[in-house]
Amino acid sequence: MSSGIILLIVAIVLLVIIAYLVGVIIRKRNDSLITSLEERKQALFALPVNDEIEEVKSLHLIGQSQTSFREWNQKWVDLTVNSFADIENHIFEAENLNDTFNFIRAKHEINSVESQLNLVEEDIASIREALNILKEQEEKNSARVTHALDLYEKLQASISENEDNFGSTMPEIDKQMKNIETEFSQFVALNSSGDPVEASEVLDRAEEHTIALGQITEQIPAIVAKLEDDFPDQLDDLETGYRRLLEENYHFPEKNIEARFQEIRESIRANSSELVTLDLDRAREENTHIQERIDSLYEVFEREIAAYKVAAKNSKMLPRYLAHVKHNNEQLKDEIARLSRKYILSETESLTVKAFEKDIKEIEDSTLAVAEQFGLQEKPFSELQVTFERSIKTLTNVESGQMDVFAAVKDIEKIESQARHNLDVYVTQLHMIKRYMEKRHLPGIPQDFLSAFFTTSSQLEALMDELSRGRINIEAVSRLSEVATVAIANLEDLTYQVVQNATLTEQLLQYSNRYRSFEAGVQSSFEHALRLFEVENDYQASFDEISYALETVEPGVTDRFVNSYEKTREHIRF
């Protein structure tokens, strides 16, 4: 053979070997793909879809939910019966084609199987999701129904246990319960007939009505208890107490108490009858009005009971107090009469005592007999309390006024005695002041002193005249005595001032001799001051003139003389 042929043969052999090797590699790769597809198929087939279907089926779906479930269940059946079988056939065909090295057709079958598995996988996911939605929805609906039924059953049990607490409302409550029961039956019928929307609305209404009725039944017993127990008990208590108070001679300003009892009982009956409408707000409001009317009756009785205690106490005190005040007034009248024989008294005291007597007489005429016959009175104790308290207040004011009048007249004799004593003292002081001035040997007496002296003397004479009368005007005596006291004190001060000015002026005039010869101002003031001193007897002006002149030449000299005089000044010996 030629070398060319040999090379050709070798090349062909190499090509065959290479082709074989390539075929083996492709076959193994396809086997791997086919195995992977088989595993995917088995994994999909092994999903717990059947279990999930059985779980949803056990929920006993109805209506639209049941229809939807059947559709998804049928889709699963189609997948298991048709799709999986078709995939199995295509996998088997791909294996045969791959084993016979028909790689192109094998690849086509592999691609076809892969596409089918993708579709099946999506369908299974949709089926499982739909089943889960159906399950959740059914569980939710079931929970709603269960919750609503539980509410209804609890309400029914509560009403049965407390039937006696609902009074006249029981027929209406039974009617409402039957209406709710009818709504539940309507819900079941609509749900079974495949109308879930309407069924849901009916269930909502049933639940709302159950809750509303439950809230109403919680409030009714308290209202009924008021109408059937509390109010009747309170009325019985009031009527019993009213009869007992009447037996104990109580009387009341209100004359319609029996009628008010009857009106309240009628209101209780009317409210009980109206309560069947379950208008609880109106019933509570009416209960409040009834309680207010009952409370007002309690207040009437409690007022009279409290008034009795006060009036009974005051009825015992009033006669004694009246006698005491009357006795005081008689004593006061006697004292004023005694004093009036010697003294001219203010008309105020007499008029006041007469006013006291009038007040006492009015109480004696209008209230004393009522107090003394307290147990036989046919008036409300509250009125008697007001009457007694008003009378006691009047007597208190009278007694206080009596004390004021007594305080005003009790010291009249002391006032006279003190005035006489003061007069004697003041007359003596007036004489001593006169002698004190005479002993000073002054050039003359200043006019202001003379005016004060004679005015004081006149005031003492006026007081003496008043005390000499047959009936002394004690007010005038008191006034004149006060005026005399002030006048004698002022005269004493003026006396000391006149004597001091005169003495100091004499001393300063003598002292000024030191400066007169060489101080023209001092000489001039000396002459002026001397004229004021000896001629005009104006000792104050004379002192001011000479002291001013000396201060200009010897500051402080005046104070030195004044201080020295005050230490040695002679006092009036009273």
Swiss-Prot record:
Main location group: membrane
Bilayer disposition of the protein: Single-pass membrane protein
Cytoplasmic side: 27-574
Annotated Gene Ontology cellular component terms: plasma membrane; septin ring
Coiled-coil annotated spans: 102-141, 274-350, 459-520
Membrane-side (Extracellular) residue stretches: 1-7
Ranges that cross the membrane: 8-26
Key words of the record: Cell cycle, Cell division, Cell membrane, Coiled coil, Membrane, Septation, Transmembrane, Transmembrane helix
GO biological process, one term: septin ring assembly
Cellular localization per UniProt: Cell membrane
Classification via Pfam families: EzrA (PF06160)
Record-stated family: Belongs to the EzrA family.
General function of this protein: Negative regulator of FtsZ ring formation; modulates the frequency and position of FtsZ ring formation. Inhibits FtsZ ring formation at polar sites. Interacts either with FtsZ or with one of its binding partners to promote depolymerization.
The protein's name in its UniProt record: Septation ring formation regulator EzrA
Native organism: Streptococcus pyogenes serotype M4 (strain MGAS10750)
Gene this protein is translated from: ezrA
